[in-house]
């Protein structure tokens, strides 16, 4: 078993995938297993769930993320959001549901620098989606 410190040796080379194939269809939150550099993370370390939302005649995915204090500052939140957008197409962070008004805007500011991702700050929250879904 790899030690957590070994998984995060290179902050610039973090590969995020999600566990088994997930169907996100209902309004219920779905917990996604997060795999970092080939190691499935314990839910004590990272919890990532998605709730589908129907807004403006489109489906969006609202993430809820928890990262253990010792693992913060390594780019995990950003990389998890980016991987999710590449796999599922979009995320939203409504102001009403956001618990962290410091880190979440930082994630969206970094996502806005990705050439294939569009980030919009609309009344009510942040939206991020693949340019190909415009």
What feature does the model see in each segment?
Residues 3-11, 20:
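Proteolytic processing junctions in secreted/extracellular precursors
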Residues 5-8, 82-85, 105, 109-112:
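Residue-level detector of alpha-helical secondary structure
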Residues 16-58:
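Acetyl-CoA-dependent GNAT
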Residues 32, 38, 44, 79, ...:
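Preference for well-ordered, secondary-structure-rich cores of eukaryotic proteins
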Residues 43, 85-90:
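Polar, enzyme-active/binding microenvironments
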Residues 57-69:
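Conserved acetyl-CoA binding element of GNAT-fold acetyltransferases
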Residues 67, 73-86:
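Conserved acetyl-CoA-binding loop-helix of GNAT-fold acetyltransferases
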Residues 92-126:
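Conserved active-site alpha-helix within GNAT-family acetyltransferase domains
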């Amino acid at each position: 078993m790899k030690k957590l410190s070994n998984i995060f040796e290179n902050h610039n080379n973090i590969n995020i995938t999600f566990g088994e194939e997930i169907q996100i269809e209902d309004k219920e939150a779905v917990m996604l297993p997060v795999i970092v550099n080939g190691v499935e993370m314990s839910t004590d370390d990272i919890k990532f769930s998605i709730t589908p939302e129907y807004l403006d005649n489109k489906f969006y995915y609202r993430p809820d993320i928890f990262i253990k204090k010792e693992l913060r500052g390594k780019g995990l939140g950003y990389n998890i959001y980016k991987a999710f957008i590449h796999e599922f197409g979009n995320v939203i962070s409504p102001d009403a549901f956001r618990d962290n008004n410091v880190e979440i805007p930082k994630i969206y500011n970094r996502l806005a620098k990705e050439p294939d991702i569009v980030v919009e700050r609309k009344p009510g929250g942040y939206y991020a989606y693949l340019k190909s879904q415009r």
